Design a protein with these regions (language model features):
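Structured, non-catalytic alpha/beta "coupling" segments that mediate domain-domain communication
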Residues: 113-123, 157-159
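Surface-exposed, charge/polar-rich loops and edge strands
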Residues: 11-17, 24, 212-214, 220, ...
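Long, highly charged, low-complexity intrinsically disordered interaction regions
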Residues: 8-13, 17-106
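Short HxH-centered metal-ligating active-site micro-motif
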Residues: 179-220
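Conserved hydrophobic/aromatic pocket- or pore-lining residues that grip, position, or stack substrates
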Residues: 169, 206, 241
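C-terminal extensions
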Residues: 13, 30-42, 56, 61-71, ...
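Divalent-metal-activated hydrolytic enzyme cores
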Residues: 183, 226-259
Length: 259
């Protein structure tokens, strides 16, 4: 992409963010003179007390989003926006996984609101990844699957990542190998093997998602995995598994006897 194209994209992004900021300000201004402001403050306090006294399980999904949005745009009633967001994305999980640009496009939201939502996902993923990084992968397998599902199940494009492991199956690097369209991301055997050698990896785990939601491996997935496994075997690099993530669950090619 040339400089003019990059500049154009930057301008479009800036315009989208500016538009979102204006939307947040207008929403707040429209609600600042609301006669029910005292009720709103009381409602916020009750929501906060329920959270502190009984934990997150005491709140419905839209109430969790409502509370988050109150932190970003505190002068308005955020319940209608929260309900609209849950309805639009279908679930709290899908909302948290939505990309920032998609969030900013929603009525009443802007960069501040989007960042408030995304930081929750970032914190959740960081928490889920801790045991994966602290223990040998094969000893923390369920933790790995939980982390991968939280991170990838709701992606709208196909993403391929590779987990590179040392001889003790400790994670060396977790890298995105490629991203593609709705249902296609290229995986290049030579590049993955070369990267394994560069990192001194003794083993790898392949991971990719199916945006369709179906985690069952395709024939192409199986053939490509076997090709990488054969290439790695010649150089002493094991392919422990190929994990496929979908909204309906997770598939392991190793568990299915496909590698």
């Amino acid at each position: 992409m040339g400089e003019s194209g990059a500049s154009c994209n930057a301008c479009l992004c800036q315009m989208a963010c500016s538009g979102g900021e204006i939307a947040e300000k207008r929403t707040a201004m429209a609600a600042s003179s609301d006669k029910d402001s005292n009720y709103g403050e009381g409602h916020r306090e009750r929501l906060r007390d329920r959270l502190l006294d009984n934990g997150g399980d005491a709140l419905l999904d839209h109430e969790i989003v409502e509370y988050l949005l109150m932190l970003a745009i505190p002068r308005i009633d955020t319940k209608p926006i929260a309900k609209q967001l849950i309805a639009h994305y279908g679930s709290l999980t899908a909302l948290l996984a939505a990309d920032a640009e998609s969030l900013i496009r929603q009525k009443g939201l802007g960069p501040r609101s989007a960042a408030t939502i995304k930081i929750v996902q970032a914190a959740a993923l960081r928490m889920l990844s801790e045991p994966v990084r602290a223990l040998p992968i094969l000893a923390s397998w369920q933790s790995l699957l939980d982390y991968l599902r939280a991170d990838m199940a709701h992606l709208t494009i196909e993403r391929v990542r590779v987990l590179y492991l040392n001889s003790k199956n400790m994670l060396i690097r977790d890298e995105i190998a490629s991203e593609g369209s709705l249902d296609q991301a290229a995986i290049y055997t030579r590049e993955i093997i070369r990267r394994s050698i560069d990192l001194g990896a003794a083993a790898i785990i392949l991971v990719h998602n199916h945006p369709s939601g179906d985690s069952a491996p395709s024939r192409q997935d199986i053939n490509m995995t076997r090709e990488i496994a054969d290439a790695g075997k010649k150089l002493g690099i094991a392919v422990h598994d190929h994990v496929i993530v979908g909204k309906d669950g997770i598939s392991s090619m190793r568990s299915a006897g496909l590698i």
